[in-house]
Amino acid sequence: MKKILFISLMLIAGITTTFAQAQIKFDRTEYDFGTFSEDAPVQKCVFTFTNVGDKPLVINQAAASCGCTIPTYTKTPIKPGEKGTVEVTYNGKTKFSGHFKKAITIRTNGVPEITRIYVEGTMTEAKSDK
């Protein structure tokens, strides 16, 4: 009998914990810089997200797939219903011209725990004055 009561209580506690949590929802998960020249290799964009859960949301980490892509993000906890941002800077200096697509992995204390956002674009060669 004690085992059944213990298991029942653990199940109820687990279900309650599952429903009370932070939840991240991005306005968009991809951004296209379009075509730009290697004369202006630094491109920036902002991703906005909302905490649609019922607990404060914390971004624990934002990591890019390449050193040429730098994410910065809201460091303070985001209350339920509030918004935060992830700013992404792509620096194509010393990179080959052409199309690129970079992933940024966002880790949070909420659901989903891991979200990937993407930036892409096409960098063209600088025009030479001949």
Regions flagged by a language model, labelled:
Residues M1-Q23:
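Bacterial Sec-dependent N-terminal signal peptides
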Residues T17, C45-N51, V88, K102-R107:
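Buried hydrophobic-core signal for structured, non-transmembrane domains
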Residues A20-T48, V52, M123-K130:
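Beta-sheet-dominated interaction scaffolds and their linkers
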Residues Q43-C45, V58, G84, F100, ...:
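Hydrophobic core residues within well-ordered beta-strands of beta-rich domains
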Residues V86-T94:
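Short, hydrophobic beta-strand segments
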Residues F96-E125:
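Terminal connector regions
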